[in-house]
Regions:
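Class I SAM-dependent methyltransferase Rossmann-like catalytic core
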Residues: 3, 17-80
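Class I SAM-dependent methyltransferase SAM/SAH-binding core
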Residues: 76-135
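A short acidic, Gly/Pro-enriched loop at the edge of an enzyme's catalytic core
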Residues: 133-146
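A short SAM/SAH-binding and catalytic strip from SAM-dependent methyltransferases
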Residues: 144-158
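Hydrophobic adenine-recognition pocket in adenosine-nucleotide-binding enzymes
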Residues: 151, 167, 180
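Conserved beta-strand signature within the Rossmann-like core of class I S-adenosyl-L-methionine
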Residues: 170-185
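Short alpha-helix
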Residues: 196-222, 240
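Core SAM-dependent methyltransferase catalytic element
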Residues: 223-246
């Protein structure tokens, strides 16, 4: 199980007194070249930040947006849901607010940085940490639907061969996979420090071939209902979503 590493996402700006631009604004100083350099650097940072933010949100965040459409696709089967992936506490909290829905979560990474609401879910037994490269501590068909996000992208085929069948084992009505697009590579690189390993983003054709090779079948009925519901609301997911038969 890969440990989370502390990530400092904010960059400390130097004090204004130490910035050459401040002292160089005197009319007799050489302000124009320094000001130009400062503006260029600022523009570069803004462009880099935009490129990362626009290249795709996490697939776990996408799960929140997809819940209404998953309910349309699976109906009563959404009564007992297991989510597997990072930030599972947030997903479980959202699912528990839905009518007639019970939810549990498995966090593939350490929960040492969990906030108070997440720790409360852990104490109540709704969320647990587990290494998904090994068999999950649940009996067969313990859940009606299993949703996995931002977890399989970090597994090699060696471990996928064990993890995917096990996820299907604990679900009775379907397995839903949220996987990143290869075009999200730049955004996912930022998560390297968080998850401790490089991401392996695959194309839809790769996943489809893999499902066939491992004997996992597409849930055509759920796929059709999901796409119809999404189309009516003009919902376009930022991640690949696969519906599989358990």
């Amino acid at each position: 199980m890969a440990a989370r590493r502390a990530v400092n996402q904010s960059r400390r700006l130097p004090d204004s007194a130490s910035i050459p631009l401040v002292s160089s604004l005197h009319p007799k100083s050489r302000s124009t070249p320094l000001l130009s350099v400062g503006l260029v650097l600022l523009g570069a940072f803004l462009l880099i930040g935009y490129s990362y933010s626009s290249s795709g949100a996490s697939c776990t965040s996408e799960v929140h947006r997809a819940i209404p459409f998953l309910k349309k696709a699976y109906g009563q089967s959404m009564r007992k849901v297991l989510h597997v992936g990072p930030d599972t506490c947030a997903v479980v909290s959202t699912l528990l607010k839905e009518d007639d829905t019970e939810a549990w979560g498995v966090e593939p990474y350490d929960l040492e940085d969990a906030d108070s609401s997440c720790k409360r879910l852990i104490r109540k037994g709704f969320v647990r940490s587990a290494d998904i490269k090994f068999s999950l501590p649940y009996r067969p068909k313990s859940f009606s639907i299993v949703i996995v996000s931002d977890a399989l992208d970090y597994l090699s085929p060696k471990y996928l061969n064990k993890t995917l069948p096990d996820l299907a084992r604990v679900s009775s009505d379907g397995l839903v996979i949220f996987a990143g697009y290869p075009g999200q590579q730049r955004a996912k690189v930022l998560e390297l420090a968080k998850f401790g390993k490089p991401v392996k983003l695959r194309s839809s054709s790769w996943w489809i071939r893999y499902f066939v090779q491992t004997g996992l079948q597409e849930n055509a009925a759920a796929t059709k209902k999901f796409e119809q519901a999404a189309s009516k609301r003009s919902y376009k997911p930022s991640c690949q979503i696969f519906h599989l038969v358990s």
